[in-house]
Amino acid sequence: MLNTGLRKGLALSPITHLLKRCSSVTDNVHRVNYCYNYHTVPNLSQRNLLPLFSPEALDIAWDQHQRQVVKELNDRVKGTELEDSSVFNIIFQTAALPEHAATFQFASQAYNNHFFFQSLIGKRAADAKKNSKYEANAAINKAVNENFGSKENLLSKIHELASNSFGACWLWIVIDDYNRLNLLRTFQAGSPYLWTRWQSNDPHLISSVPDYSARPRKYAHVPILNLCLWNHAYYKDYGLLNRSRYIDTWFDCIDWSVIEERLTNSLV
C-alpha cells in the first residue's frame, strides 16, 4: 500500500538552497549593515543529458530559465514574511492568496523545474544502468505494470495526454487519492501538491470536482516523475514540430533509480 503523506527528509521536500547573503549600505553619516535570505540555483548532479538536451539547450532549459525564475522569486519575497521560507513552503503559503499569485507561480515553477531535472540522466548512462544487475527498480516496475500495464503503455498514455495539451504545462506521474499511480497535468506552474492549484481541466484526468473539505491529507498527490512541456525545454533541439520525439527521448533519459527512491520513500 502506498502512503501519500510525505516523510521528513523525503526527496520531494524543498529542493532549492536557502542561503544568507550579507550586504551593506553606506551614507555620509551612518553605515547600515543588513542581511537577508535568498534562494540560489543549485548545481545539477547530471550535466551530460545527451541526447535529450544539447549543452546549448540545457543552458536555456536549466541555467537561464531557473536563474530567471529564482531571481523573480527572490525579488518578490525580499523584505517580506516569506523571505525565510523554503521554496516548498512558499508554494503552500501563497497558493490561496491572490496578492501573492506571481510569487506562487515563480516558487512552483522553480520547484517543478528542479524536480524535472533531478530525474534525468544521459541515455548512455541510462542504458548502462538498465543493463546492470544492480539496477532492479523492482518497486517502480511493479507499480507501473500494475497501473499502466507496462512502461510502453505508460509512454503511450503520456503521448496521448501531451497531444491534447495546449500551451505551457507539466505532465506528472503521481500517487493519487486511491494509492495508485496516475497521470496528472498542471498548466503553467500548477502544483500537484494542492487540489486548488492543479490548474488542469482535462476530463480524462479529473472526473469530478474534488471535495476539498473531505480531504484528510496535507498533500493532494505525491509526484514521483514529471515532464516539462514548456516550449523552452524542447524548442532549441527539437523545434515546435517534433515534440513527440522530445518525449520519446525524455523517456529514454529517465533515471529510474531516482523514481524508485521517490516511490519507495512513500511506501508504508
Curated annotation (Swiss-Prot):
Keyword annotations: Mitochondrion, Ribonucleoprotein, Ribosomal protein, Transit peptide
Keyword Transit peptide carried by entry: yes
Annotated Pfam families: Sod_Fe_C (PF02777)
Highest taxon listed in the record's lineage: Eukaryota
GO BP terms in the entry: mitochondrial translation
Cellular component per GO, a single term: cytoplasm
Location in the cell: Mitochondrion
Range of the transit peptide: 1-23
Broad class of where this protein is predominantly found: mitochondrion
SUPFAM superfamilies: Fe,Mn superoxide dismutase (SOD), C-terminal domain, Fe,Mn superoxide dismutase (SOD), N-terminal domain
GO molecular function annotations of the record: metal ion binding; structural constituent of ribosome; superoxide dismutase activity
InterPro entries documented for this protein: Mn/Fe_SOD_C, Mn/Fe_SOD_N_sf, SOD_C_sf
Oligomeric form and interacting partners: Component of the mitochondrial small ribosomal subunit (mt-SSU). Mature yeast 74S mitochondrial ribosomes consist of a small (37S) and a large (54S) subunit. The 37S small subunit contains a 15S ribosomal RNA (15S mt-rRNA) and at least 32 different proteins. The 54S large subunit contains a 21S rRNA (21S mt-rRNA) and at least 45 different proteins. mS43 forms a dimer with mS42, building a large protuberance adjacent to the mRNA channel exit in the mt-SSU body.
Family note: Belongs to the mitochondrion-specific ribosomal protein mS43 family.
Function of the protein: Component of the mitochondrial ribosome (mitoribosome), a dedicated translation machinery responsible for the synthesis of mitochondrial genome-encoded proteins, including at least some of the essential transmembrane subunits of the mitochondrial respiratory chain. The mitoribosomes are attached to the mitochondrial inner membrane and translation products are cotranslationally integrated into the membrane.
Protein name: Small ribosomal subunit protein mS43
